[in-house]
Amino acid sequence: MAAVPVLLVVHHTASPALHSLFDAVMTGAREGAAADPATPVDVVARPALTAGAVDVLEADAYILGTPANLGYMSGALKHFFDQIYYPCLEATVRRPFGCYIHGNNDTTGALRSIQAATTGLKWELAQPPLEVIGPPTKENLEAAWELGAALAARLTLE
């Protein structure tokens, strides 16, 4: 683990609903990271199309955010996994992650595709996936905040 643990949020924020979820995740992560000044956590956000292997290797935990597009994760998040898979395969085994997915009708295929990629990388699910259908509710945004806060807090314990 790095001297100061790093939480990397990789996202494809293509809609107002995803932007709301991303903001809530980031707020929770930053507040969770700042909860104990003795154990700081750096929270880094990268769009899925620009995040790369160096970002992943320098991080200690991950949050993945994507729309559910045509029964799959976004092409941007798929591109991210394609770019990082082999360079990060051995070095990131058992790293904790969480994810949030927004869909208008269904998120099943998007979640399944994320699970396939993260299983291949041997990452460990640290929080239940957050799946949101339709406009995010207050409860959805609170769950997104909790996702960010929980992953950041987990890094203060390691």
Question: Where are the predicted features?
Answer:
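Short histidine/acidic/glycine/proline-rich micro-motifs that form metal-
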Residues: 15-16, 101-106, 132-137
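Short helix-loop-beta junction
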Residues: 23-39, 119-124
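Hydrophobic residues within alpha-helices
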Residues: 21-29, 114, 147, 151
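N-terminal beta1-alpha1 ligand-phosphate binding loop
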Residues: 2-33
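Generic structural signal for residues in well-ordered beta-strands
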Residues: 41-45
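Helix-loop-strand module that forms the ligand-binding subsite of alpha/beta enzymes
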Residues: 48-125
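Residues at alpha-helix caps and immediate loop-helix transition turns in enzyme cores, especially N-
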Residues: 21-22, 76, 110-113, 140-143
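Glycine-rich phosphate/pyrophosphate-binding loop and the adjoining helix
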Residues: 36-37, 52, 124-158
